[in-house]
Design a protein with these regions (language model features):
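Structural and coupling elements of P-loop NTPases
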Residues: 1-554
């Protein structure tokens, strides 16, 4: 169901998906929800559309930190999950231990007795089978469908009551305009009928249902009528928003509004003003960037966009680095060129006291890396809650840490673990501000010339630090080209060429090599930059640069 390019590349669900399958005489509506806490806006709305849920856990890894986030929301909604232990055909799979870990998590999250008595199955999605006991034959998915019919209660809505349809997801079509997706809680809806939309402020807007669609497989099918319990997509209401209710115009009854977690992280999107501006992007002006951000608000409920004192800058807030990183990467692939600032946490006042967001951080590392992780997280105000030593030379660590303590940590974590560690985190709560957190300890290497970086200049400067670029890369004044070995920033001329004489030959460079550059992905760049630095984003390049006006375009 993950059709978005970024979803396929990252192996995560970003946008919720709807489908429906018919098993025996029952239509089963299925909604795939994101698991990562950054997409909490999607998760909470989806849980309001369903009567039950299937919790899928890995037979080897057990519940992940993002599992905790989704499960907590499901339990708060009173849902009773069916647990499916997946990938039981993998090496090192330990299905029964995974079930025990799930039970521990249920108890930790305050599940009631009925929820803790959850049904569970063993499955392999790749091989296409599910079974009630490990000793059963590997056949098909029928045991899972039977479990759904047995344990998920039928819809409680009444098709004879006045219409109540809650908007839980927004979509957009060039032909139909805004499309609202939601569940019919009561009543019946017909294509072409007049309906009323109860807005958040209580205002009632009337409109005609121009198109009514249902779900079948991975497609949408046009419907003439649908009734309570079904998930439908409706066109006709151009200004509908998440949580509002489509109802009967003669007897309007609004459902309770959906509460979504507020953003915890913010950054500034601005027009690219580097010396290379406008050379690689199709959409580069402030108007084009603003229009794209406003369009994103139509479907991305957890996002906030604010205009600033400068017409070239926009404040963008989201649920986390992944949430904002997905938006930046999507815009980049669409041809947009812009620059973004370092992510900053959003502070809140709780009971008259300034507070900041805290995260639950889970690490899976080799035993040799445990000491380095504990030391560095301690410097970032992290408190270790749990530590488990595995029998396979691996250790699982759990920390509670301020969200700002995680900004820039992933790069350090990969160095400490030599790329062998697994890191996951999810939003926990707001707590009093804890004080200063140590920032990046090394300065950066900055180009003070515009031109093309040469092997000769880079080789001479190699002992100053590590580079982010290779010879032949175009650079400009103020562009960050590497990390200094010392705490201070250092400006370099990387465009210097070798002066050839009778005693020197160009072939001499072929005998020596540069160290491999540090690759800067978008996520790594966002974590790496400091408060006086920017990430320049274009369809072709990710560059780091200084914010100082002396380096900006004249």
């Amino acid at each position: 169901m993950d059709s978005n390019d970024l979803e396929r590349e990252r192996g995560i669900t970003i946008l919720s998906k709807n489908t429906a399958v018919r098993y025996k005489d029952t239509l089963i509506n299925i909604v795939d929800t994101p698991g990562h806490a950054d997409f909490g806006g999607e998760v909470e709305r989806v849980l309001g559309m369903v009567d039950g849920c299937v919790l899928i856990v890995d037979a080897n890894e057990g519940p992940m930190p993002q599992t905790r986030f989704v499960l907590k929301k499901a339990l708060e909604k009173g849902l009773r999950p069916i647990v499916v232990v997946n990938k039981i055909d993998r090496p090192r799979a330990d299905p029964h231990t995974a079930v025990d870990k799930v039970l521990d998590l249920f108890l930790e999250l305050g599940a009631d007795d009925d929820q803790c008595d959850f049904p569970y199955l063993f499955a392999s999605g790749l091989a296409g089978f599910a079974k009630n006991e490990l000793e059963d034959e590997d056949k098909d998915m029928q045991p899972l469908f039977e479990a759904i019919l047995r344990h998920v209660p039928p819809p409680v809505g009444d098709p004879e009551k006045p219409l109540q349809l809650q908007v839980t997801t927004l979509d957009y079509s060039e032909y139909l305009g805004r499309i609202v997706i939601g569940r019919i809680h009561n009543g019946t809806i017909n294509a072409g009928q007049q309906a009323a939309l109860v807005k958040e402020d209580g205002k009632i807007v009337k409109a005609k249902i121009s198109k009514l669609m249902g779900f079948e497989g991975l497609s949408r099918v046009e419907l003439e009528q649908s009734s309570a319990g079904n998930l439908v997509a409706v066109a006709g209401f151009t200004d509908a928003n998440i949580g509002e209710t489509i109802t009967c115009p003669n007897e309007p009854r609004a459902l309770p509004l959906i509460k979504v977690d507020e953003p915890t992280l913010q950054m500034t999107f601005s027009v690219n003003d580097s010396p290379f501006c406008g050379k690689e992007g199709d959409f580069v002006t402030s108007r084009q960037i603003r229009d794209r951000l406003m369009r994103e608000l139509q479907t991305n409920v957890a996002l906030r966009v604010e205009e600033t004192d400068s017409p070239d800058k926009f404040g963008v807030s989201g649920r986390g680095e992944l949430h904002l990183g997905i938006l930046i990467e999507t815009m980049r692939r669409e041809g947009y060129e812009f620059q973004v600032s370092q992510p900053q946490v959003i502070y809140r006042e709780v009971n008259g006291q300034p507070c900041e967001p805290y995260e639950l951080l889970a690490l899976d590392v080799s035993e040799e890396a445990v000491g380095g992780c504990i030391e560095r997280l301690g410097q970032r105000k992290g408190e270790m809650q749990d530590m488990q030593m595995g029998g396979n030379g691996r250790s699982q660590l759990e920390f509670v840490i301020p969200a700002r303590g995680l900004i820039g940590f992933r790069g350090e974590f990969m160095r400490i673990t030599r790329g062998d560690g697994i890191m996951n985190h999810s939003f926990l709560d707001y707590r009093p501000i804890i004080g200063d957190i140590s920032a990046r300890r090394n300065g950066v290497l900055i180009s003070f010339e515009e031109g093309v970086a040469t092997f000769y200049a880079m080789k001479n400067a190699e002992d100053r630090g590590s580079f982010f670029i290779t010879p032949g890369t175009k650079v400009y004044k103020g562009m960050i080209v590497g990390e200094n070995n010392r705490p201070q920033d250092l400006e370099l001329n990387l465009c210097k060429t070798k002066q050839l004489t009778n005693h020197r030959a160009a072939s001499g460079d072929e005998l020596v090599q540069l160290q491999a550059p540090v690759e800067m992905s978008l996520e790594r760049a966002l974590e790496y930059i400091g408060p006086d630095e920017l990430v320049e984003v274009t369809p072709e390049s990710i560059r780091l640069r200084k914010m100082s006006k002396k380096f900006a375009r004249r």
